[in-house]
Amino acid sequence: MSNKKNNIIKIMILGEKEVGKSSLLIRATKDEFNSQYIPTIGIDFDYKIMEIKGEKYKLQIWDYVSHDHINVFNKQVLSNTKIILLLFDLTNKSSFDSINNWLLKLDQSNKDNSIQIFLVGTKSDLISNRQVSLLDIQSKFIQNNNNNNNNNNNNNNNNNNNNNNNNNNNNNSNNNNNNNLQYFEISSKDNNNVEFLFTSVIDYYLLKAQPKFEEEIKNKKKKLKITVSWFDI
C-alpha cells in the first residue's frame, strides 16, 4: 500500500453524547485534553499521521454529532469509512446499553462488512465510578467461539436442528458479529492506551485489508496477461 491515496484511512468515532468522542479526537490529534464538555455541532474531524512498519498513514478521524442517528448512517457520511470506533462511557451504564442499538443500525449500513468496528470503553481513569464491568463487556460483545463450535456439532447430528439454527443465525446475525468485537479501554484525560488503540486498529485493519489488496493486484495481472495474449495472437 505505497500509493499515497491508499494510505489515507477514514475513521469514524461514534457513540452517545458525553462518552468522550471529542476528547479522544483532540487527544489523538493534538495530544491535549479539555475538561470542559463542549458538544459537537454537526461534524468535526482532524488528521493524525502514524508510521507503521516503515509506512506512513494519514488517519482522517471524524467525530459525528451523537443525537443525529439517522444522518450518521447516511451513505455519504459513511462513504470511504474503513474503521468505526464505537465508544461508551465506563461510568455510564446507559451508554453501554445503547451499544447494541448502534450495532444493529451499523449492521444495516455495513452489510458487506467493509467497515471494521471496534468497541472502546472510555474514562478508565474514573475507577471508583465504574458502572460497567469487564465481565459485562465480555459476556455481551467479546465471547469466544466455543458456542459456535458446539452449534456446528449439533448441526451435524441433527438436520432439523440445522435448519432451525440457520433460521436463528439469520435472525440473530447481529449478535453473532457483535460477540467478536475487538475491545479497548482508554482514558483521554490520562492519555492511557490512546496511542495503543490507534496503532492496534490500524494494524488490524491492514491485516484484514491486505488479502483484498493482493487479490485486486492478482486480478489486474490476470487482465493484463489476457490483454497481452490477445496482442500476441
Curated annotation (Swiss-Prot):
GTP binds at residues 15-22, 63-67, 122-125. The keyword Transit peptide does not apply. One of its GO terms (cellular component) is membrane. GO terms for molecular function: GTP binding; GTPase activity. Residues 144-180 have a biased composition (Low complexity). GO terms for biological process: exocytosis. Residues 143-182 are annotated as: Disordered. A motif (Effector region) lies at residues 37-45. InterPro entries: P-loop_NTPase, Small_GTP-bd, Small_GTPase. Keywords: GTP-binding, Nucleotide-binding. Belongs to the small GTPase superfamily. Rab family. This is Ras-related protein RabV. It comes from Dictyostelium discoideum (Social amoeba). The gene is rabV.
